[in-house]
From Swiss-Prot:
Its main location: membrane. GO terms for molecular function: chemorepellent activity; fibroblast growth factor receptor binding. Residues 36-540 are extracellular. This is Leucine-rich repeat transmembrane protein FLRT2. PANTHER family: AGAP008170-PA (PTHR45712), LEUCINE-RICH REPEAT TRANSMEMBRANE PROTEIN FLRT2 (PTHR45712:SF16). SMART domains: LRR_TYP, LRRCT, LRRNT. GO terms for cellular component: cell-cell junction; endoplasmic reticulum membrane; extracellular space; focal adhesion; glutamatergic synapse; neuron projection; plasma membrane; postsynaptic membrane. Residues 419-517 form the Fibronectin type-III domain. The gene is Flrt2. Residues 562-660 are cytoplasmic. Disulfide bonds join C36-C42, C40-C49, C314-C339, C316-C360. Self-associates (via leucine-rich repeats), giving rise to homooligomers. Interacts with FGFR1. Interacts with FGFR2. Interacts (via extracellular domain) with ADGRL1/LPHN1. Interacts (via extracellular domain) with ADGRL3 (via olfactomedin-like domain). Interacts (via extracellular domain) with UNC5D (via the first Ig-like domain). Can also interact (via extracellular domain) with UNC5B, but with much lower affinity. Interacts (via extracellular domain) with FN1.
Length: 660
């Protein structure tokens, strides 16, 4: 029996060839993956070809790349090679900021996110979108897409599309034939004036719809347009021209509704009836003056309501809103209900309104009419048609009625109401007797506490010592006792912790003068006249005038005395002036070698006095003295120092002292 042998060298060669082929294939695949266009930069699965002034997509995009950056170039529609469509690994492409005027062809077939914003795209064809069966997110913001530029049913070709952004284009209506699986649609900042009832008919998966900044009116929205959006969670129709909220809003899942910046002037009672899951509602910047009672009753899940910048008119029609705001749960945040009218409640929060003071034509009586009164009360002649008994010292002041202020009498100033500042706080003063005043007030808004201050106005410009009392907000009157008879008091009421106002704005002050003491009622007319004169002299302004006049009078007297003194001194000085031309001692102290120019010589027996110009005279001490010379002549000299030499008519120097 023979032994079989195997030829191992032939079998080994086959195995070696097999491994060489596999290695070569792997090498080719790896080298293909590692390839990168020369004008781009590759980093793992990212290829960066952005901002390189490219006019076309570079060739040689390697397989395995997932994100392709081609934005901010100059790529046009002719710059997409056919081989780009076969790169299967790319799922995100950035092509914004280029020069495309049509939706591009030959994009990677498996792309899921495509950014084409900030181009000049005007048309969208069905063929271009039919190549992108896996496209889920499409950004076409800030282009030139019009309604006629979109081919019918073009977006329906992208069967996987879920997010479509068409903001800042030229659409005049919502494109018809959108993908049924679309979840978010943005068509804001367009020119949409019409939405047909077919626009959202099959969009049963749409959750977010933004149509802000268009030309929509209630007439341009077909009836039942939004009723098909059964899964809608957020709806924003801001900056349009609606006069009331769109009807038939889907309430099954709607959570956020934004209606601000429209022309809404009324809200029907059933506008929000089905929105039981609504959590956020914004009706700011509209023309709402009032709300129908019960319009928010069905919003049981509401968390935030914003109503800023509406011309809310706070009359009886808004009373239910005030009550509703006081009893809403703490989980609900309401902002913006501020009164814009009437004038006396402008700027006040609706929540803080005191409805007892608002005028209601049918149910609530109006406020009494107040006649302006002078700032201080002074006794006047009693009216013949009214008879009021004199108040006694021990009488008890009646409690004021909260909803009505006392009227102003026409008699001797026993009772008066100060016209309120902007009618937010109304202050009245009732004179009980000569040492007691009762102050009553009524506020249009809720106040935690009041500070009542009073000070006696005396001869001093700053008044007397200021006294004050803190009163709780529930109290509406206070009696001031132990006052001085026939004295003027300044009374101020300051609301504290007011919700809407600063203290300075709502402070109201008044002045009142207490009656004269009843013990002095029998005084004669002269004493009354003296008291009146004394009281008027104590006026701060009169006192200031007297002081100022006295100061001016003293200054005038001092100025007159000073002028008289200077005038007298000037006359006395002018009488002493004598002729002098400015002498120098050296002129005649050199043994007669130089003649003294300050000596007036008279050699004749007679002379005539001639007036000299006063401007040539200089101040100095002048004396005229007769000089007896040795030859019997008379001369004159002015001797200033004892040892001066004299100059005589005979031209002979004399060393003797000057003598008369």
């Amino acid at each position: 029996m023979g032994l079989q042998t195997t030829k191992w060298p032939g079998r080994g060669a086959f195995i070696l060839k097999f491994w060489l082929i596999i290695s070569l294939g792997l090498y080719l695949q790896v080298s293909k993956l590692l390839a990168c266009p020369s004008v781009c930069r590759c980093d793992r699965n990212f290829v960066y070809c952005n901002e390189r002034s490219l006019t076309s997509v570079p060739l040689g995009i390697p397989e395995g790349v997932t994100v392709l950056y081609l934005h901010n170039n100059q790529i046009n529609n002719a710059g997409f090679p056919a081989e780009l469509h076969n790169v299967q690994s790319v799922h995100t492409v950035y092509l914004y900021g280029n020069q495309l005027d049509e939706f591009p062809m030959n994009l990677p077939k498996n792309v899921r996110v495509l950014h084409l914003q900030e181009n000049n795209i005007q048309t969208i064809s069905r063929a271009a979108l039919a190549q992108l069966l896996k496209l889920e997110e499409l950004h076409l913001d800030d282009n030139s897409i019009s309604t006629v530029g979109v081919e019918d049913g073009a977006f329906r070709e992208a069967i996987s599309l879920k997010l479509l952004f068409l903001s800042k284009n030229h659409l005049s209506s919502v494109p018809v034939g959108l993908p049924v699986d679309l979840q978010e649609l943005r068509v804001d900042e367009n020119r949409i004036a019409v939405i047909s009832d077919m626009a959202f008919q099959n969009l049963t998966s749409l959750e977010r719809l933004i149509v802000d900044g268009n030309l929509l009116t209630n007439k341009g929205i077909a009836e039942g347009t939004f009723s098909h959006l059964t899964k809608l969670k957020e709806f924003s129709i801001v900056r349009n021209s609606l006069s009331h909220p769109p009807p038939d809003l889907p309430g099954t899942h709607l959570i956020r509704l934004y209606l601000q910046d429209n022309q809404i002037n009324h809200i029907p009672l059933t506008a929000f009836a089905n929105l039981r899951k609504l959590e956020r509602l914004d009706i700011s910047n509209n023309q709402l003056r009032m709300l129908t009672q019960g319009v928010f009753d069905h919003l049981s899940n509401l968390k935030q309501l914003t109503a800023r910048n509406n011309p809310w008119f706070c009359d009886c029609s808004i009373k239910w809103v005030t009550e509703w705001l006081k009893y809403i749960p703490s989980s609900l945040n309401v902002r913006g209900f501020m009164c814009q009218g009437p004038e006396q409640v402008r700027g006040m929060a609706v929540r803080e309104l005191n409805m007892n003071l608002l005028s209601c034509p049918t149910t609530t009586p109006g406020l009494p009419v107040f006649t302006p009164a002078p700032s201080t009360v002074s006794p006047t002649t009693q009216s013949p048609t009214l008879s009021v008994p004199s108040p006694s010292r021990g009488s008890v002041p009646p409690a004021p009625t909260p909803s009505k202020l006392p009227t102003i009498p026409d008699w001797d100033g026993r009772e008066r109401v100060t016209p309120p500042i902007s009618e937010r706080i109304q202050l009245s003063i009732h004179f009980v007797n000569d040492t007691s005043i009762q102050v009553s007030w009524l506020s249009l808004f809720t106040v935690m506490a009041y500070k009542l201050t009073w000070v006696k106005m005396g001869h001093s410009l700053v008044g007397g010592i200021v006294q004050e009392r803190i009163v709780s907000g529930e109290k509406q009157h206070l009696s001031l006792v132990n006052l001085e008879p026939r004295s003027t008091y300044r009374i101020c009421l300051v609301p504290l912790d007011a919700f809407n106002y600063r203290t300075v704005e709502d402070t109201i002050c008044s002045e009142a003068t207490t009656h004269a003491s009843y013990l002095n009622n029998g005084s004669n007319t002269a004493s009354s006249h003296e008291q009146t004169t004394s009281h008027s002299m104590g006026s701060p302004f009169l006192l200031a005038g007297l002081i100022g006049g006295a100061v001016i009078f003293v200054l005038v007297v001092l100025l007159s005395v000073f002028c008289w003194h200077m005038h007298k001194k000037g006359r006395y000085t002018s009488q002493k002036w004598k002729y002098n031309r400015g002498r120098r001692k050296d002129d005649y102290c050199e043994a007669g070698t130089k003649k003294d120019n300050s000596i007036l010589e008279m050699t004749e027996t007679s002379f005539q006095i001639v007036s000299l110009n006063n401007d040539q005279l200089l101040k100095g001490d002048f004396r005229l003295q007769p000089i007896y010379t040795p030859n019997g002549g008379i001369n004159y000299t002015d001797c200033h120092i004892p040892n001066n030499m004299r100059y005589c008519n005979s031209s002979v120097p004399d060393l003797e002292h000057c003598h008369t």
